[in-house]
Amino acid sequence: MKQKIVLATGNLGKVKEMSDVLADFGFEVIAQTELNIESPEETGLTFVENALLKARYASKMSGLPAIADDSGLVVPALGGAPGLYSARYAGVDGPDADAKNRAKLLHVLHHIAPTHRQAKFVSCIVMLQHEHDPSPIIAEGECYGEIGFAEKGENGFGYDSLFFSPEVNCTFAELATSEKKKISHRAKALSVLQTKLATKGA
């Protein structure tokens, strides 16, 4: 029998990407939206703090173990922006948020030369057995690339169509989901999580 765990996100892209992998770990993933749990205000100053906030809240509201991911795009030429504010970079919510965020990123980078458009995706995953778990499992992953001058690809979500990965010589949005799962920041963090779970005997 699989262990139920609440995934603390309402982002459908993350739900699919993480559910595919977590199912292999023996977990039955329930998105917090299925339980009518809303996300708390993200007041942390780091990806780890925000992931902890979300996981603790989801566990508190559901009474189940919880897992949360906080991730973002870091562009050194912009002083680390969008960073913690990647999901709300353009200041809008709703179905148009991703497109508006990408448009803003292209706009603020329009004068930046190709040699200075480096970027990295960061993912921090936190897993709790219960709301007050004193020793949460924390797993982090990063992947490096650069921001293109135009969107390419139809797959993925968020900034995927702008993030060019030298490792695969295309944007994340040009990859099939199965290919992205092998190299993405979230995939790397989930791999670290899997190792830590095995070590902990969870």
From Swiss-Prot:
EC number: 3.6.1.66
GO biological process terms on file: nucleotide metabolic process; purine nucleoside triphosphate catabolic process
Statement: the UniProt record of this protein carries the keyword Hydrolase: yes
One Pfam assignment: Ham1p_like
Annotated Gene3D superfamilies: 3.90.950.10
CDD domains named in the record: HAM1
Gene Ontology molecular function terms on file: dITP diphosphatase activity; ITP diphosphatase activity; metal ion binding; nucleotide binding; ribonucleoside triphosphate phosphatase activity; XTP diphosphatase activity
Binding site for substrate: 9-14, 71, 157-160, 180, 185-186
Cellular compartments per GO CC: cytosol
Keywords per UniProt: Hydrolase, Magnesium, Metal-binding, Nucleotide metabolism, Nucleotide-binding
Function: Pyrophosphatase that catalyzes the hydrolysis of nucleoside triphosphates to their monophosphate derivatives, with a high preference for the non-canonical purine nucleotides XTP (xanthosine triphosphate), dITP (deoxyinosine triphosphate) and ITP. Seems to function as a house-cleaning enzyme that removes non-canonical purine nucleotides from the nucleotide pool, thus preventing their incorporation into DNA/RNA and avoiding chromosomal lesions.
Family: Belongs to the HAM1 NTPase family.
Protein name as it appears in the record: dITP/XTP pyrophosphatase
Source organism of the structure: Pasteurella multocida (strain Pm70)
